[in-house]
C-alpha cells in the first residue's frame, strides 16, 4: 500500500499569558514520529498580515505535512487533538482550530493564504471556502467553538504549501511552565553565532541599537529563534549550542519569514483599506513634517487620492531618510495601513524612484568682481556690495543643486523588522534545499 499525504494546519493556541503554536507543533511532530509517521517537508511556520487586530503576538500559523500509511492516519489525528488539548491556552483570547487535508491541498486554500498575507479577511469567508470541500478529504479536526477564530490561520497555513520563497528558523524551547521574561542564554553566544554565519544567519542582532533580535521577552516557551537560508547551519548550531544551555527541545521550520511576502501587492491610494499590507506609489505633496516623538509624516498622492505615510522614530534609518524627502519626489512605499483620524500607512520601506530637482533661485554674480549681488530696491535691479557695480537689468539665476538623498531603496533598522521583513543583506540569495536535513532526522528534538 502506498503512502498517503496528510496536511494539518493549526492556529490560535496561545494567549497573552503564554504558550505558542510552534510548541504545539513540536509535540505533534514528536508523537507522530514515535508512531512511525513520515514527513513530506519540514513543518511550516506561516506568518500572515502583521497589521490585523486579532492576533496575540506575531500572527503566525503552523502547518505540518505528513506522509503516512493509511492505517496511521487516525493515530496522527489523535496526536494532533491530544497536543491541542494539552498545550493550547484556556483564555478568552484563545480560539484554536486545526484543519486536516488528505491528499492535495485544495487550490482555493492558496487564495486564502494570499489574501491573509495582505488584508483582514473575516472567518465567514474562510468558512464558505471550507463548505465547498465537505467530506473525507478536508475536515475541521479540532475546535472549541462553532466558529473558531483560528480557522483563518489554519487554512491559510495549508494554502502556503508548497512555499516558493522561504527561509528557515530554528526555535529552541524551555518548559511551557516557565513564564518569566528572562531567558537562559547569553548575548555573547548569540553575537558569536551572528558574526560566524552572517548573512546566511540573519536578523539575530541589531548593531546600531545594540539589541538582540533572536530572543523574545514574553511568557511563551521560546528561548530563542535563529533564522537562516541554510538548514544545515541551523542543525549544526543546534548540536553545538544546545550543549551549553538548558532547554526542552527544538524544532526547525521552513517559513515565509524574511521574504516580504506581505508587501507584494500594489494598490492605488483610493483602494487602500484599514489593516492592508500594501505598496503605494505617488508623489510627495509637501515638505515632510516632524511631529512629537520625532516621527515623520509625509503626504503621498497618486491620481486617485492622497495618503499619510508615517515613518516612526523606531524605524531608525528609515525615519532619518524620510526627513530628506522633497515636494515632487516620486516614491514607492510599502507598509501597513492603520486607522487613526483617517488612514495612515506605517512605512516599512521606501523606494525613491525619481527625486525632484533641487532648484535654487539665486541673486546674480557681479560681472566685475564675481561677488554675489544684492537687491538695489524694488525695480532698481542689483548692486555689488564689494565694488559698488549696479546692474538695473540683471535678474535672478536658477541653479540645480545636488540632492542629499539618491534614488534607491531604503529599509528600517533591524530592531524595527516585522517577522516577514526581508533584510537587505539576503537580497538576491536563495535558500538551500532541506531534503538532506529532513532525511537526517536532526530537525527536531
Swiss-Prot record:
It holds the Pfam family tRNA_anti-codon. InterPro entries: NA-bd_OB_tRNA (IPR004365), TiaS-like_TCKD (IPR053870), TiaS_FLD (IPR013696), tRNA_Ile2__agm2C_synt (IPR024913), Zn_ribbon_TiaS (IPR055394). It is found in: Cytoplasm. One of its GO terms (biological process) is tRNA wobble cytosine modification. Disulfide bonds: none annotated. GO terms for molecular function: ATP binding; ligase activity, forming carbon-nitrogen bonds; nucleic acid binding. Residues 278-349 bind DNA. It catalyses: cytidine(34) in tRNA(Ile2) + agmatine + ATP + H2O = 2-agmatinylcytidine(34) in tRNA(Ile2) + AMP + 2 phosphate + 2 H(+). Its main location: cytoplasm. Keywords: ATP-binding, Cytoplasm, Ligase, Nucleotide-binding, tRNA processing. Its EC number is 6.3.4.22. One of its GO terms (cellular component) is cytoplasm. ATP-dependent agmatine transferase that catalyzes the formation of 2-agmatinylcytidine (agm2C) at the wobble position (C34) of tRNA(Ile2), converting the codon specificity from AUG to AUA. Belongs to the TiaS family. This is tRNA(Ile2) 2-agmatinylcytidine synthetase TiaS.
